[in-house]
Amino acid sequence: METKQFKAESKRLLDLMINSIYTHKEIFLRELISNSSDAIDKIYYKTLTDDSLKFERDDYYIRVVSDKENRILKIADTGIGMTKEELENNLGVIAKSGSLQFKKENEVKEGYDIIGQFGVGFYSAFLVSDDVTVISKAFGSNEAYKWNSKGAEGYTIEPCEKEAYGTEIILKIKDNTEEENYDEFLEEYTLKSIIKKYSDFIRYPIKMDLTKTKPKEDNKEEFEEYKEEETINSMVPIWRKNKNELKSEDYENFYAEKHYGFDKPIKYIHTSVDGVVSYNAILFIPETTPYDFYTKEYEKGLELYSSGVLIMNKCGDLLPDYFGFVKGIVDSEDLSLNISREILQHDRQLKLIAKNIKTKIKNELESLLKKERDKYEKFYESFGRQLKYGVYSDFGSNKDILQDLLMFYSSKEKKMVTLAEYVSRMPEEQKYIYYAVGESNERIEKLPQIEGVLDKGYEVLYFTDDIDEFAIKMLMNYKEKEFKSVSSGDLGIEGEEKENTSNSDDKKNKELFESMKDILSGKVKDVRASKRLKNHPVCLANEGELSIEMEKVLNAMPNNQNIKADKVLEININHDVFKSLKEAYEGDKEKLKLYTDLLYNQALLIEGLAINDPVEFTNNICKIMK
């Protein structure tokens, strides 16, 4: 009998999985039972596509058997079974999912719930066993095969005898160690508890022979043990249970069973609606961002059931994109089981459900923000960007739904605040909601442009996400207060007297500023005296709708079109540097060019923009140091 080797990457993955992916060894039973449920699902799917086959539910079950004396644990099912090739392909290559392959081969796009998407769950058996045997007979085949492995070194496959189709997994449970008690995985009570904890909603019976006691017939005062078969799981979907009977742990276990994530949900929503359209739904807001969430590969959607039967694995129409992070299920008796994807997309009932779900999610998030601020801020850290994308997309049509869910870091509060909180404490004379854009809060606090607004005592919101300013441009205003960047040309904070003084400064220094503008030859739209600078000598401001930060974001995209914002070089005429500029203008034009180039490049660096000629810049610094 030949021993075959796992592929090298499979060895590494097996080691990684055992030591990293699964933190609790009891998870192995959940994974193996889920695989058994998948196998029965596949039989059921075949009956839907083959009229000659009948599905008698009583014939399909999962059985768990413990043999404490021989340290053997068996998990058997009456599912579809596997051929020799399937054993080798599905179990010989870790992370090769048989369920996923079944979906591809049978074009199962919706209509069936097959849990095993990732192909690693089976190998959790090695958490508690160092000798794993799989005996399987495929549906429609006369041959059975035995697969055996004692770990990452390899496996064997040989013919064997098995009467009925299905699969039996036989685990030789490890001996106890000082750190681990493996005996518990042979105890009836422990096995029953694990099944109830993780697999209570598996829709096929999970059977065990449980030890019970009864009085002896010849002596009623003495008791004897006997075995009686029981179905351990309830098989009643959690969403059909009374909410008052469920605990947080029940929802968390369901979340884990459905593989919605390795985290715990930060919020669950259990809702039942009766009306024009009736449905039950359980929705989850995850705690952490899925690794692929902000990629094209991520697929949003809720599982859609009709009368308890899955008809679509991920129904994207049930969620708007900005709530695409929500996981969960919807079950409605008003949807037909055989409804096609095309009809479903235009189904009136489905649209009503989607509208209700959108409102429910929004209300729950608002409640979380109001009542559990810490949880909301944790959620926002993971998914706030998606809400801002929602404001920006579809030409701002969703801004009224999302604007009260937005949060930004505040210069005054030194924490995240909502727009409503900002507006509520605006001084009466303040006209605008001010914001500053930068790579981080620390960088923003050092921006020269922010000095004038802070000096006035006004609060500034910090925008550190690429999407922030784009979203706010689409929002335009909040409670009739317009948004204003601290880098915009007109801040709207000058008094009449100061405004006149500033204009007078521009007139007095008109020739100097014109000379500087000529030196920069088209790099800036204008050079003028700054109304905002207090301690810094120079900064860049922008005019028009396109800001400097938006220029950076757009030019970083793959279709770079070399977009340029209209920039204004602002000079602090109260800074010592300005005196040097005036002296150079009056007596040394070469020095004026040197100073102008240095100040412009300094302003570029402050904005995080690249300077055109770093060598010339460093040479100019050396010149003024001589």
From Swiss-Prot:
Coiled-coil regions, chain positions: none
PROSITE patterns hit by this protein: HSP90
Concerning InterPro entries, the annotation shows:
HATPase_C_sf (IPR036890), Heat_shock_protein_90_CS (IPR019805), HSP90_C (IPR037196), Hsp90_fam (IPR001404), Hsp90_N (IPR020575), Ribosomal_Su5_D2-typ_SF (IPR020568)
Q: Tell me its family.
A: Belongs to the heat shock protein 90 family.
Specify where it is mainly localized.
cytoplasm
Write out the entry's keywords from A to Z.
ATP-binding, Chaperone, Cytoplasm, Nucleotide-binding, Stress response
ATP-binding: present as a keyword of the record? yes
Q: Name its cellular compartments.
A: Cytoplasm
Which residue ranges are recorded for the region named A? 1-341
Q: Which GO terms describe its molecular function?
A: ATP binding; ATP hydrolysis activity; ATP-dependent protein folding chaperone; unfolded protein binding
Region span, B: 342-552
Instruction: Output the CDD domains linked to this UniProt entry.
Output: HATPase_Hsp90-like
Q: Which gene encodes it?
A: htpG
Q: What does this protein do?
A: Molecular chaperone. Has ATPase activity.
- A cellular-component GO term for this protein: cytoplasm
Stored Pfam families: HATPase_c_3 (PF13589), HSP90 (PF00183)
Q: Which domain of life is it from?
A: Bacteria
* Self-association and partners: Homodimer.
Per the UniProt record, the lineage of the source organism begins with: Bacteria, Bacillati, Bacillota, Clostridia, Eubacteriales
Q: List the residue ranges of the region (C).
A: 553-626
Biological source species = Clostridium botulinum (strain 657 / Type Ba4)
Write the protein's name: Chaperone protein HtpG
